[in-house]
Curated annotation (Swiss-Prot):
PANTHER family: PHOSPHORIBOSYLAMINOIMIDAZOLE-SUCCINOCARBOXAMIDE SYNTHASE. It comes from Corynebacterium diphtheriae (strain ATCC 700971 / NCTC 13129 / Biotype gravis). One of its GO terms (molecular function) is ATP binding. The keyword Nucleotide-binding applies. This is Phosphoribosylaminoimidazole-succinocarboxamide synthase. Belongs to the SAICAR synthetase family.
Length: 297
């Protein structure tokens, strides 16, 4: 349910986030507990998910050396009490029309494309790679941003160049791969593999590239436990892949080819998903989730 924040104008809604205007220069981004998969918003919500995503984004915004969209602390006076801990005050930006994906391992849509063409978004890869193969080096695989309910479409780097120009496209690619590599090294120290992730960038009033939206959360990333890694198999994960696997497994009775919406998630899947999200936060940050602002109110 969308929070009714009467002091602000509601600007837009996504699958997970609600955006409100604070003033001429700032927005309030509120992260819900909604979870989406295969372009559907699922029922029921995952308890505490919005706070986990906000906590992880804040952690990485403060620990990754790159300009970001934050315009205030997590307890900024502009944040209403009812959304404290799952909202952040952000700068208004001109958002760029691409999801900037970095892949260090082959899985998901990247694996499917590789099996069909030997490439991912136009990047040629060696023969013989399988599920969860580590790539020789991380690759940049952009996608267009789809409207709510539509599919993001993987595109080649050339498409980014055509849309944004060579200099800006190179800047996007370099930033994406640098941030991914920095975060992957941090995760590795904590016994976790960052298989892939996606970023969104915008431009500030000076035309400077700024990291925005969410960053390195279990919604936007695939996190695998390093001690269970085995090439050629679907990996256990600390992200919403667990939900995707249940939806496409025999117990759900649903298929991605169905025209009907997915079924409601059973309580066991909801709780297991919450546990995975919380564990991802605690293992990567070294912090206790119960100490995050708003968790014990």
């Amino acid at each position: 349910m969308r929070p009714e924040l009467s002091q602000y104008t509601h600007v837009s809604a996504g699958k997970v986030r609600e955006i409100y205007e604070v003033d001429d220069e700032r927005l309030l981004m509120v992260v819900s507990d909604r979870i989406s998969a295969y372009d559907h918003i699922l029922e029921p919500e995952i308890p505490d998910k919005g706070r986990v995503l906000t906590a992880m984004s804040m952690y990485f915004f403060h620990n990754i050396d790159f300009p970001n969209h934050l315009a205030g602390p997590i307890d900024d006076p502009a944040i209403p009490e009812e959304v404290l801990g799952r909202a952040m005050v952000c700068k208004k930006l001109k958002m760029l029309p691409f999801e900037c994906v970095a892949r260090g391992y082959l899985t998901g849509s990247g694996l499917k494309e590789y099996q069909e063409t030997g490439t991912v978004c136009g990047v040629e890869l060696p023969e013989g790679l399988v599920e969860a193969s580590k790539l020789p080096e991380p690759i940049f695989t952009p996608a267009t941003k789809a409207e709510l309910g539509d599919h993001d479409e993987n595109v080649s780097f050339d498409v980014v160049v055509e849309k944004l120009g060579e200099a800006r496209a190179n800047e996007l690619r370099d930033a994406t791969l640098r941030i991914y590599s920095e975060a992957a090294a941090l995760a590795e120290e904590r016994g976790i593999i960052l298989a892939d992730t996606k970023f969104e960038f915008g431009l500030d009033e000076d035309g400077r590239l700024v990291l925005a939206d969410e960053v390195l959360t279990p919604d936007s990333s695939r996190y695998w436990p390093a001690d269970g890694y085995e090439e050629g198999k679907v990996q256990p994960s600390f992200d919403k892949q667990y939900v995707r696997n249940w939806l496409t497994g025999p117990k759900s009775g649903w298929s991605t080819d169905d025209v009907t919406p997915p079924p409601s998630l059973p309580g066991s899947v909801v709780e297991a998903t919450r546990e995975r999200y919380v564990e991802a936060f605690e293992r990567i940050t070294g912090k206790k989730f119960c100490e995050w602002i708003g968790c014990c109110v």
